[in-house]
Amino acid sequence: LYDQILEGMLDFIDGDDDADYTSSDVEICGSLLSKFISSVPEGISHDKAMVEVKTLVLALNELNEQCDFSLIETDQREGICELVFQTLAAAGVEFDEDVTEDWREW
């Protein structure tokens, strides 16, 4: 899933489309996602996990804004949300709603 998200972003750059972001922006996005995954270990408290979600989402908001709101499109948004949900589930954090929605601007 992680690779699919980033490959989708890179494919847009490589295509005929005129992207408002660079491969460096995609690398930054990948770093943010990797940092999130590693910051949510198994057994993390729900409250601490939500702090990590908020940190990720706000950082992605800022990055996407710097890219003229074109880095995170529908496919990437869905993939990022799914990656967040899978990471939380693997850590044993229960949730019953979209935990990114309160902060997400993409």
Question: Residues of each region from the PLM?
Answer:
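Generic structural signal for well-ordered, non-transmembrane alpha-helical segments
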Residues: E27, S34, K54-N61, E78, ...
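Mature extracytoplasmic domains of secretory-pathway proteins
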Residues: L33-L63
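Short intrinsically disordered, low-complexity coil segments enriched in acidic
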Residues: L1-Q4, A49-V53, R104
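Short terminal alpha-helical segments
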Residues: L1-P41
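Amphipathic alpha-helical binding modules
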Residues: C67-W106
